């Protein structure tokens, strides 16, 4: 599904990634661990097409993402990649349901079944009863579940999560862990997660350890 070859990334004179070669297959659950500053989040952002590598190639489903123009890259990201971050970035003026539907609106993919799809995602995540609440009416764990539902609304090929439990208490973090495992095991969702959480890292079928811009799979 994803092949990284010779990936290097520098910001000015600072080299963050020093040559990454790795593959992610459909159905994988990959956890990326390592100390702060090792390049974990940078690598995830490159896979998502949020930033460009200084050297090397990234192929997504056989397509070289570095060769895509901005419109094609945005379309790929909206339709095939689900993104979850430590901070949910929900729009405060929209309800949970409306936040989940955002990728459909942005991609001009709204149709008669979109709301049903969104409600099904919220139900899977255990918060269908919160669909019409604003973000400030939800707990931190509920907000993160809405963010996960939003990432899943277009049925992406891969879910990329950057410290998805970093801002949650242990109970809510464990709930998110369980949801990610269910997505992977029951639905075959490909998951790649950057984490400092040992429990979440241990769930990965593959564990990548990053140190000083290098990866040990």
List each model region and its residues:
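Conserved switch/coupling elements of ABC/ABC-like ATPase nucleotide-binding domains
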Residues: 212-217
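ABC family nucleotide-binding domain
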Residues: 1-210
């Amino acid at each position: 599904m994803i092949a990284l070859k010779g990936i290097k990334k520098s910001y000015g004179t600072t080299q963050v990634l020093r040559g990454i070669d790795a593959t992610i297959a459909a159905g994988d659950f990959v956890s990326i661990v390592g100390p702060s500053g090792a390049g974990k989040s940078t690598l995830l952002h490159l896979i998502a097409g949020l930033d460009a590598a200084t050297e090397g190639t990234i192929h997504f489903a056989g397509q070289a993402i570095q060769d895509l123009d901005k419109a094609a890259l945005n379309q790929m990201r909206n339709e095939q990649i689900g993104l979850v971050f430590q901070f949910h970035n929900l729009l405060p003026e929209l309800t949970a349901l409306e936040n989940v539907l955002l990728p459909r609106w942005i991609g001009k993919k709204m149709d008669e079944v979109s709301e049903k799809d969104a409600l099904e995602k919220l139900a899977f995540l255990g918060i269908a009863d919160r669909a019409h609440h604003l973000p400030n009416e939800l707990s931190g764990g509920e907000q993160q579940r809405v963010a996960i539902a939003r990432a899943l609304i277009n049925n992406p090929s891969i879910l990329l999560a950057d410290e998805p439990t970093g801002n949650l208490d242990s109970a809510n973090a464990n709930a998110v862990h369980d949801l990610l495992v269910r997505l992977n095991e029951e639905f075959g969702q490909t998951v790649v997660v950057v984490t400092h959480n040992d429990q979440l890292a241990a769930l990965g079928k593959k564990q990548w350890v990053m140190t000083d811009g290098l990866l040990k799979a």
